[in-house]
Each structure stands twice: as structure tokens, then as C-alpha cells.
Amino acid sequence: MTAELFPEQLERITGYTFRDKSLLLRALTRLAYSKEQGLSEDSHLDALATLGDAVIELIILTRLVKGGEHDKGAVSLKKMDLVNMSVLRDAARSIHLEQYVRWGKGEARMHVWTSGRVLAECMEAFAGALY
């Protein structure tokens, strides 16, 4: 998207208000944008995406085990069904996350958010910021 929306609108959509607004902004900032703008090394979403990936897996695994699933193979298969690029992409699209992300110029020109992988990574970063 060429002009991102205000992050506060995303808070209204999700029903979650960030105490630390800089964390939300970081979760919405792609590395390319950060470099183009000369922002600090810790201003982009990459680390939060890694954290978010782990958090999402932990939540899903906890729910599966608490829900009575105890077979390791079954837990792994169900986790793969519930935590994958398509599910994360769809979750991101449901809140129109791509409209809030600060994309690099090349990313915006190429509409990289149409790639499931890129949008899934943005959703992971958002989850990491929520955590």
C-alpha cells in the first residue's frame, strides 16, 4: 500500500491497545522501509516476527495438549494444519494488516503483500508485538 493507515485504527479493529506504541510501529515496519528512512537497526519487524512465530506455536500447542491431544504425531500434524503460511496470511488479511505496514518503496511498487509468505511474516510480527 502506498500510504499506511494510522496504527490506532488497527488497535480499534483488533480491540487491543498497545501501551508501548513504538512496539506496534516496529511490528508494522519492514526492513526495506527502515533502511530507506535511515531508522535504527532495531526499528523493523524481523525480530518480532521470530518471536511471534514462537508465541503462535506455543499458544496452539498449549491448546492442543490442554484439549486432550497427547499423541506427539497427532499434535504435530494438527499444529501444521493450524499454524501455516495460509492461515497466517488469512488472519492478516482479515484485519487488513497490509494497509498498516510501512513498506519499502520497491515492496510497495511490487505489491509484495500479495505474497502469502510476506504477509504471514507481518502477522507473526504483530503477534510478537502483542506478546
PLM segments and residue spans:
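RNase III-family endoribonuclease catalytic core
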Residues: 1-131
